[in-house]
């Protein structure tokens, strides 16, 4: 059974990703927002998007524009639109299996400068989120939520690791209560999601990441912003080092 705080956490993440679009590029930005929610696992494979009326309000668009965007993503294989009482737009996208060849292709498509920029952006906003959260004096329910996200990640089956890793990292930003910071962290994660999905998962690296995740949480719960920043920096630099190794 889901807990009330789980629902609040999921709702916060949806609000972070499915934010209003600009009128001039409503269709394109709607596709971008929905694709971000899908690729980040905010709406996992097999689950359905929120109801059409709710989505249109969240995104600040007409239902006609929303339907066009959903149709485009359905045609591209990301969604399965079902009619009827139990219908809706169901996520069919499943991240591809990690592959070093795919990793090189993703990096080539991004370009060296864009890759460096994306990694720098992620480091800045995730370090900032951890620092802010460490100074916030988390209430008991929020401490429990952070610990539960860590526990879920530690117990994740390999095929669900990236999605729960994303949920853990985004939870840190969302728990700060800053919509702008949470949005920035979601954007940063989106820029490297294909990259992270393509990195082969090595058990030694996953074990090391688990230690680093624990260090991040420990520093946050101890109210140690400098320690939180150092822990996030070490963790993200480790990911960058692994990336360089597979590209060498």
Regions found by a protein language model. Give the residues of each.
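Short, charge-rich amphipathic alpha-helical segments embedded
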Residues: 237-248
